[in-house]
């Protein structure tokens, strides 16, 4: 392991447990922080963030809103304007599935990414360590099978974009520095250059990795789908692994076929 997942998770849970004892005060401090940091943004100026001194002030000044209310600000951000919704520049644009109409763009800042990393991503390791308290860390934190892939997708202006569930990994590798050595697949499988179904390829690597200790997925249904694929294509996978071949039924494109056959 290159990352101390036990320590990372322990620190995350310690922060969580400490926060639960003063949740209301932390929420008030967070509101004050958000208002102070974004008072000079277009949205903050519109609703007078700099003059808000209490929750009641906030409730009086800032109306309930939906995504339509933010769309003009997002459009200006995408056009190159700055400090619209937040003073910090977005580092990622999450794109919704469009299930209720046209897909929506949701700007995400670096601060939000750090909250995601230190709370959600790291917290999972803490919960695993806490639940299996009698196990040694090396028995829990070996090679990882991440069932998702995080294609390097960008908007025409160069901003990182994609599904919110992929955003953290894309951001962690924003400069190409994400260390994938703890994962059972090569880095190019985790971060393909384009969106492509790579379940077959990932399973080939996962089934061959004897040090595998964890299966990761943002959504459980994705994990179930990968396991269903393995169950339904068991003989094909084993045959190809034994003979170093890639069956046409894998659906892989030429470059990926050549990587596995080579």
Residue ranges and their predicted role:
Residues 1-26, 31-262:
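Active-site phosphate/ATP/adenylate-binding loop shared across adenylate-forming ligases
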């Amino acid at each position: 392991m290159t990352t101390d997942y036990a320590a990372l998770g322990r620190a995350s849970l310690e922060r969580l447990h400490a926060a639960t004892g003063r949740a209301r005060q932390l929420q008030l401090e967070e509101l004050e922080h958000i208002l102070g940091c974004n008072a000079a943004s277009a949205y903050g100026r519109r609703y007078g963030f700099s003059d808000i001194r209490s929750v009641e002030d906030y409730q009086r000044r800032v109306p309930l809103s939906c995504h339509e209310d933010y769309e003009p600000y997002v459009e200006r951000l995408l056009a190159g304007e700055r400090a619209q919704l937040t003073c910090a520049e977005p580092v990622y644009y999450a794109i919704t599935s469009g299930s209720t109409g046209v897909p929506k763009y949701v700007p995400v800042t670096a601060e939000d990414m750090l909250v995601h990393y230190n709370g959600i991503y790291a917290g999972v390791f803490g919960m695993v360590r806490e639940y299996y308290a009698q196990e040694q860390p090396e028995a829990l934190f070996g090679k990882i099978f991440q069932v998702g892939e995080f294609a390097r997708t960008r908007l025409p202006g160069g901003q990182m974009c994609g599904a919110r569930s992929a955003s953290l990994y894309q951001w962690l590798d924003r400069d190409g520095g994400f260390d994938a050595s703890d994962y059972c697949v090569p880095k190019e499988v985790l971060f393909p250059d384009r969106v492509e179904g790579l379940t077959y390829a990932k399973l080939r690597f996962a089934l061959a990795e004897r040090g595998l200790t964890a299966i990761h997925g943002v959504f459980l249904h994705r994990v179930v789908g990968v396991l269903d694929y393995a169950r339904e294509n068991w003989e094909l996978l084993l045959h190809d692994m034994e003979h170093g071949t890639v069956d046409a039924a894998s659906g892989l494109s030429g470059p990926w076929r050549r990587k596995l056959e080579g």
